[in-house]
Structure formats: structure tokens, C-alpha cells
């Protein structure tokens, strides 16, 4: 053949990259919006290629760009990310008050969505997200990750095995399920909201207007943003709507 005559050897791509190698052309491309907390866990997934990250906090953005290396572009405005035609999937790891609107806008931009829990702050917002996904033919995955990791709330109980037992009928029917919060972490202590907070200057690195987004305009205080935002109805759906999903979702799955 011409190839043999030229002394050219064609090596299968899996040989160069190993048995689990996925060439860039076959990988899904993604962007992660919100990299100050849970978004760090969305940066590196097998079979995907990270193209962009976005955060309203410049410190979060710069530190994460150093971590992921070259080839990844940083943004302060998520709308610029959605305009990129080369992004297949948008990972949303912002506070919950942004989940609904960002998911809908991502679907409108032709992106599939992988969203951190809770899906949205309210049931009504969640219904709008479902409608948008159906209308635009996009996929939506909610990252209730204890189900996917098959480890009920990190306590070692395999969810899939428990589902098999329930499906077998060995436990009888109907079942009564009691959910308790024995996790070794006091959510209420760490994430309870505070009243009468004195307004403070907005840090230079934070685009506070972008962080607030669709939430009511309130004076800045560090306790209302980042890790402690969960204690405020403006940004989250309370303990049951947020961390409660980790308990409730696996139960819904195996029932």
C-alpha cells in the first residue's frame, strides 16, 4: 500500500493514550460556573474537557485558573460563557438563587446542564427549568451525588443494594422510612442566618451585583455570601430544601 511504501505506521489512538484514553475530539466540553466551593469538584471528570470557568469573585477565579492550567479561560459574567458555541455542558455550582435562571438560560443557549443541588430555591422555579429543558431538548442532571456514589450520606450504606432489598419485597409494603440527621455535622450551627447585620463595604474582588443576581437587593455582609449563604431565604430553600435532599433523594430512589 501507499502507507507501507512510505514507511508510515498507523498506531491506534488507544495505544498512545492507554486503554481508557478518550481523545479530545470525542470528549464533551464543559464550563463550570461557580468555583468557590462545590464547583471545585466539577473541574475534572473523565470524558470531559474543561474550557471555561466563571465566578463573581476574582479571587476564586484566579486561584482556580492557576489550578487547572492553560487552555481554560476565566469569566466574571456567566452570560459570556453561554455565548461560546464550543461548550457542550454547563456545570452550575453557584448558590441556589441562581440555579433556576442559569439553567433556563443555558438551555436556551443550547447547553446541557449539570446542576448542584438543590435544583432550585422554590418548586415553581424547578417546574420552569423542566419546561425549558423539554422545550429546547436539552439534558438536565441534578448532582445529588450520594445516590450516584452509592453511599448513603457517606455513612457506608450502599444505596443500590438497599434498593434491591426493597424491590424484592423482603421488607414488606408499605414501608415507613424515618430520616434523621446523624451525620456528625451540625448544619444549623454553621449555617443559621443572622439578623440586624451591619452593612459592610463590598470587597474589591467581588462583583456583588452579579452575586446577588435575581435575589432581593440587600446590603453586603460577608455572612450572607459564600459558605454561609445557606442560612438566608433570599438565597436558599432552608435546611430541608438544601441539605435535606441528601437524605430524601436516596429514599425516593429506592422506594
Predicted feature locations:
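Glycine-rich, aromatic-lined ligand/substrate-binding cores of catalytic
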Residues: 199-255
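Beta-loop-alpha module in the N-terminal Rossmann-like domain of NAD(P)-dependent dehydrogenases
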Residues: 72-132
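A contiguous active-site-proximal alpha/beta segment in oxidoreductase catalytic domains
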Residues: 112, 120-210
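N-terminal export signals
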Residues: 1-16
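NAD(P)-binding Rossmann-fold cofactor-contacting core
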Residues: 49-68
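Glycine-rich Rossmann-fold phosphate-binding loop(s) that bind the pyrophosphate
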Residues: 35-36
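Conserved hydrophobic helix-helix packing surfaces used for dimerization/oligomerization
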Residues: 28-30
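N-terminal Rossmann-fold NAD(P) dinucleotide-binding loop
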Residues: 39-40, 99
Amino acid at each position: 500500500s501507499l502507507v507501507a511504501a512510505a514507511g508510515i505506521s498507523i498506531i491506534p489512538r488507544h495505544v498512545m493514550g492507554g486503554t481508557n484514553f478518550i481523545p479530545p475530539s470525542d470528549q464533551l466540553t464543559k464550563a463550570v460556573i461557580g468555583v468557590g466551593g462545590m464547583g471545585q469538584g466539577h473541574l475534572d471528570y473523565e470524558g470531559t474537557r474543561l474550557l471555561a470557568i466563571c465566578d463573581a469573585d476574582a479571587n476564586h477565579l484566579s486561584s482556580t485558573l492557576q489550578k487547572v492550567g492553560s487552555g481554560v479561560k476565566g469569566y466574571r459574567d456567566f452570560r459570556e460563557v453561554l455565548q461560546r458555541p464550543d461548550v457542550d455542558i454547563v456545570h452550575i455550582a453557584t448558590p441556589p438563587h441562581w440555579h433556576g435562571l442559569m439553567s433556563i438560560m443555558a438551555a436556551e443557549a443550547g447547553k446541557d446542564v449539570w446542576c448542584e443541588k438543590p435544583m432550585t430555591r422554590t418548586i415553581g422555579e424547578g417546574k420552569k427549568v423542566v419546561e425549558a429543558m423539554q422545550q429546547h431538548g436539552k439534558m438536565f442532571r441534578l448532582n445529588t451525588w450520594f445516590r450516584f456514589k452509592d453511599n448513603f450520606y457517606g455513612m457506608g450504606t450502599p444505596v443500590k443494594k438497599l434498593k434491591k432489598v426493597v424491590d424484592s419485597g423482603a421488607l414488606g409494603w408499605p414501608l415507613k422510612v424515618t430520616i434523621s440527621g446523624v451525620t456528625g455535622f451540625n448544619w444549623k450551627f454553621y449555617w443559621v442566618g443572622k439578623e440586624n447585620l451591619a452593612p459592610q463595604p463590598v470587597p474589591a474582588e467581588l462583583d456583588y451585583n452579579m452575586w446577588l443576581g435575581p435575589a432581593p437587593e440587600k446590603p453586603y455582609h460577608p455572612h450572607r455570601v459564600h459558605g454561609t449563604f445557606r442560612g438566608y431565604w433570599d438565597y436558599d430553600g432552608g435546611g430541608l430544601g438544601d441539605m435535606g435532599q441528601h437524605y430524601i433523594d436516596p429514599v425516593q430512589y429506592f422506594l
